[in-house]
Amino acid sequence: MWTKPSYTDLRIGFEVTLYFANR
């Protein structure tokens, strides 16, 4: 699943995950 590592998408996903987890 790491054929095309989109750092932008990954960063946004991580940020959203942390945001939701922090809530």
UniProtKB/Swiss-Prot annotation:
Cite a single Pfam family from the UniProt record. Answer: PqqA
Q: Does the keyword Metal-binding apply?
A: no
Q: In which pathway does it act?
A: Cofactor biosynthesis; pyrroloquinoline quinone biosynthesis
- Pyrroloquinoline quinone (Glu-Tyr) cross-link located where? 15-19
Please name the InterPro entries in this protein's record.
Answer: PQQ_synth_PqqA
Q: Which UniProt keywords apply?
A: PQQ biosynthesis
Organism domain of life: Bacteria
Biological process (GO), any one = pyrroloquinoline quinone biosynthetic process
NCBIfam families, from UniProt? Answer: PQQ_syn_pqqA
Q: Relate the protein's function as given in its record.
A: Required for coenzyme pyrroloquinoline quinone (PQQ) biosynthesis. PQQ is probably formed by cross-linking a specific glutamate to a specific tyrosine residue and excising these residues from the peptide.
The UniProt entry's sequence similarity note says: Belongs to the PqqA family.
Q: What is this protein called?
A: Coenzyme PQQ synthesis protein A
Native species of this protein? Stutzerimonas stutzeri (Pseudomonas stutzeri)
Question: What taxonomic ancestry is recorded?
Answer: Bacteria, Pseudomonadati, Pseudomonadota, Gammaproteobacteria, Pseudomonadales
